[in-house]
Amino acid sequence: MKTRTLVAVLAIFAMVSGACGGDDETDAGTTPATTAAPAETSAAPAADESAGGSAMSGLDIDAVLAADLDACVDAPSGDPIRVGMAMDFSDVVGFVDIPGSKLVPYVAALINCAGGIDGRPVEVRVAEVGDDAALATQELLDWGAQFLIGPPFADFALPILQTTGGGVPLFVAASTEPTLADMSINSYLVTFDDHGMAGAAAKWALDEGITRAIVFTEGEGIPYTGVNPDAFAAAFVAGGGEVVSTQTYVWAADTDFSAQVNEIAGISENNEVVFSAALAFQVTALRGQLEGQGLDGLTYIGTDALDATGISVEANNEGIAHTPHTSISAGDPIDTLLAGYEAANGEALESRGFMALYVDSMFLGIQGILDCGCDDPAGIGEAVQQISGFSGLSGEITYAGTNGIPPKAVPINRIVDGADVLVATIGG
């Protein structure tokens, strides 16, 4: 499949200029379109279309979130800050990369509406990796991207890193794969990794007084679908628990668990915790089949995949726990940002708990530029490696003293009376 590219700056320009009095309108909320070698476009409104006022200094996240696209300050006119997004729109991770690639240009529009970064406009270009992540990456580098936001899985992230030669910062926004964090090649997670996530799930189960576990895996050591169960089992046993059954399945595909259920029914005491990295529809299907065998006392906890695939709206979801990247409450900064996007674009973004990671990826790259006072990717990367205590939308982020995995607390959410609520926070 040919690599498809999008100049998200076009959407930003249309969004902001339309809000500030321009005549042309572009629907920036649609799935990115296919274009070839797009032209560069400023991401800021023209100066004579602004409402005037003073621009923000540096990166002021509060000012960005408060920006009103109907009342922008004077347009930034300095050299642009260029953000490249190499995104995977496939069925495997498109449910996070697609909405993420829509939100980041919108936030860039808010930055520019607030006057830019010390008078510099922020431009965003999105390239779909398709079947050639290297080509998509090269297009972004040729455009002048100073840092990149990448897809969550190694099969596309590694070709991106091979193309950059480790010389350009890459924030793998939605990834929890520990192998993708390596500051020596400028590769950074923006959240906790699989070990932190699964370990927190195990601790929560133990704290609930559960001492027996049933684990579903795709196989030992398999990225994400095997590593998370491995990490859960290790932490659960280390904490005094026992894994009484380990079952295999096909991630994102299986919904008939009759063989596994029959085996579990023979050993279960109906008081175990069931852990997997399965998708929401798989967990609820498994639960229904286990309940059909009379096993209605089990506790279910899963990974960030449950948040990404809509556990909060699945049938038979009551009591299911999961580990989202952010626990969003009404009126908080993330909720306000997503509501603003929806109002501006007429579309509610999916995978809400992941969206702050994409925005923080852009913020972190910009902070690196501010800290180094430079535009070259190598210098930006050196500055990113020294970031400590950065207050992002998704929480506090520190890279100094790490290998690119920020030490972050893991929220535990649970469906309680039909609502997805925070019930614990582990670590941090």
For each predicted feature, which ranges?
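An alpha-beta-alpha
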Residues: 89, 187-252
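Segments of small-molecule ligand-sensing domains
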Residues: 344-355, 366-419
